Design a protein with these regions (language model features):
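Generic secondary-structure signature for well-ordered alpha-helical cores
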Residues: 6, 28-32, 58, 80-87, ...
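Glycine-/small-residue-rich active-site loops that bind phosphorylated ligands and cofactors
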Residues: 18, 44-45, 97-100, 125-128
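Non-catalytic terminal and connector segments of soluble metabolic enzymes
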Residues: 20, 24, 109-115, 127
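A contiguous loop/helix-start segment that scaffolds small-molecule binding in enzyme catalytic cores
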Residues: 35-36, 114-197
Length: 197
C-alpha cells in the first residue's frame, strides 16, 4: 500500500504478534489529534485488528472515533480462485490456539462437520502446530464422505500462489502451511471442470 501513502505520512510496522502494541501506538497518535489508519490484511473485522481496536477503545474509555472499512478476506480470495465454493451456508474456523483453547476449536470443527457447513479454515498450521490439521481431517471423515470436495489456496493473490482441488480422502495436511486457506465443501459441493462449486 506504500504507493498510496503520501511521503509525509508516518508509517509504523510492528509485524506479527505485536498487534496490541500497534493498537496502543494508534491510540497514542489519535488521542493527540492525528488521523490514524490501522491497516490489517484482508478484512480488519475478520481475524484482523478491528476487534482489538474496539476492545481497546472500551478499555481506555476513549473518545476517539473509529471508522471500520471492509476488505476482502482471505477465504473470499481463496474461494474466487477455486471457483464458487461458498454458495450456501458456511462457517470460518481458525485453527490457531493462541486465543482459543484446542478443545473449543475441536468442538467447533465437529459442529461444522456434523451440520454440513462449507468450512473455511484459517491458520491451518504453524511451526509449532501441525497435528491439529490431521485431527480436523479425521473429524470431518466421521461425518462426511471421503469423496467430499476440499480445496486449498496457498499464498492467495501473491506470486507464489498455488490452487488445488482434491477430496477429503486425498487431502494431505503435509501440503499445507500457515499461508494456506483450506475450504471444505458440504455434501452438495462438487468439482466441475476444475471448479469447486
Amino acid at each position: 500500500i506504500e504507493k498510496f501513502i503520501s511521503d509525509d505520512t508516518v508509517c509504523i510496522d510492528t509485524g506479527m504478534k505485536k498487534e496490541r502494541q500497534r493498537a496502543e501506538m494508534a491510540f497514542e497518535y489519535a488521542e493527540k489529534g492525528n488521523t490514524v489508519c490501522v491497516v490489517s490484511s484482508g478484512d480488519a473485522g475478520i481475524y484482523g485488528m478491528a476487534p482489538l481496536i474496539y476492545e481497546m477503545k472500551r478499555e481506555k474509555e476513549s473518545k476517539v472515533e473509529i471508522v471500520s472499512i471492509p476488505g476482502i478476506s482471505a477465504f473470499q480470495k481463496a474461494a474466487s480462485l477455486l471457483g464458487a465454493p461458498m454458495g450456501h451456508d458456511f462457517c470460518v474456523i481458525s485453527m490457531s490456539d493462541l486465543m482459543t483453547p484446542w478443545h473449543v476449536i475441536e468442538k467447533r470443527i465437529v459442529a461444522a462437520a456434523e451440520a454440513d457447513f462449507i468450512t473455511a479454515v484459517y491458520n491451518p498450521k504453524s511451526n509449532g502446530r501441525y497435528w491439529q490439521l490431521y485431527r480436523l481431517k479425521e473429524l470431518f471423515l466421521k461425518y462426511r464422505s471421503e469423496d467430499n470436495i476440499v480445496g486449498y489456496v496457498r499464498q492467495a493473490g501473491r506470486e507464489e500462489q498455488s490452487v488445488k482441488i482434491t477430496t477429503l480422502k486425498d487431502f494431505n495436511p503435509e501440503d499445507i502451511d500457515m499461508f494456506t486457506v483450506v475450504i471444505i465443501g458440504n455434501s452438495q459441493s462438487y468439482n466441475w471442470n476444475g471448479s469447486f462449486i
